[in-house]
A protein has these predicted regions:
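N-terminal (or domain-start) structured segment
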Residues: 27-117, 155, 163, 167, ...
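A ligand-binding cleft/hinge motif common to bilobed small-molecule-binding domains
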Residues: 99-109, 175-177, 204-234, 312
Length: 323
């Protein structure tokens, strides 16, 4: 055998033993295609404003194509259901909101597993949830609502931005402790619920969407469902202060399907962290009465796991579990 033929034969033999994956073209650097962020609520609420702030920052500062799409309904579970089934390449992401991940799965069947089907990328904001009424309402405080409900069973109508969400469950737990009967009216988003309230169709709304309406003097806060008071409204009590069994705020962030590539996670962690220092984002937080709260992917995942179990236990203890 000639030397040239021998070398050629060895090269072919070695090549035959190399896995085909080594010859595959390298994956393009993230992001290689446009990104869509799915919002679990209708347009116009606090979640919408925060999502558009994230998308605008990424477009303007990172020069990438980012779209925002809305998937309201079904207890805010449509968006996470679609994200869970999406290709894990970072082109489909979602706005994280507490309810569809931490409460709804304990109360109804959903097509995803909160602890297994997602990559929690970064949290960026919290907004105290509140029960609020029109500014001209007869109810000046939370005690007024309880007295009215006690004397008029079922006549106090209230709604939230999503059925069986954390706001819904927290208020139901408080009302149960007070032994009063009210009428819950479901809506697909905070903006829709507020429109119904201002139109006189319901008496109150519980959501994180009150900021612009509060600033305009259209609504009055009666009680916060969390642990922290609002500095500008020190007389508004919290559920924690009143000793109610569930006290929680709304946390928002970015998530994607399970098994997202590390570079996609790092990319959006960076975008989120940078955005939180921008004047534009601070203005949005002021509009929605929110505050900054950065959680990296690892810390965000731990937060979800801890609160999923805690809220599940609380829901079961309250006898609210229907699944």
């Amino acid at each position: 055998m000639h030397r040239r033929q021998f070398i050629k034969g060895v090269a072919l033999s070695v090549a035959a033993q190399v896995p085909l994956s080594m010859w595959a073209p390298a994956r393009a650097a993230y992001p290689a295609k446009p990104v869509t962020i799915l919002v679990p609520f209708a347009a116009g609420g606090a979640g919408d404003l925060l999502t558009r702030a994230i998308a605008d920052y990424a477009r303007n500062k990172r020069s990438i194509a980012v779209g925002v799409e809305y998937r309201p309904g079904a207890g805010a579970t449509i968006a996470p259901s679609q994200v869970a089934r999406a290709e894990p390449d970072g082109s489909t992401l979602g706005l994280y909101s507490v309810s569809p991940f931490l409460t709804v799965p304990h109360l109804q069947k959903v097509s995803y597993d909160t602890l297994k089907d997602f990559t929690y990328i970064a949290a960026c904001a919290f907004i105290p949830l509140a029960l609020y009424v029109p500014a001209e309402s007869q109810h000046k405080d939370w005690e007024s609502v309880l007295r009215f409900a006690k004397n008029n069973p079922g006549r106090f109508r209230w709604g939230t931005s999503g059925v069986r969400g954390v706001a819904h469950i927290a208020v139901e737990a408080a009302l149960k402790k007070q032994d009063v009967k009210t009428t819950f009216v479901p809506f697909t988003g905070g903006a829709e619920a507020i429109t119904a309230m201002l139109g006189g169709h319901i008496e109150a709304v519980v959501s994180a969407d009150y900021g612009p309406h509060l600033a305009a003097g259209k609504v009055r806060l009666l009680v916060l469902t969390g642990t922290e008071k609002l500095a500008a409204y020190p007389d508004v009590p919290t559920f924690h202060q009143l000793g109610y069994p569930l006290s929680t705020e709304a946390i928002y962030g970015v998530y994607g399907p399970a098994n997202l590539p590390a570079d996609a996670v790092t990319y959006w962690e960076g975008v989120t962290r940078e955005m939180m220092g921008s004047d534009e984002f601070r203005n949005v937080l002021t509009t929605v009465n929110g505050g900054p709260t950065y959680l990296s992917s690892g810390a965000f995942k731990q937060n979800v796991e801890d609160n999923y179990r805690k809220l599940g236990e609380a829901i079961a203890d309250l006898g609210l579990k229907s699944k």
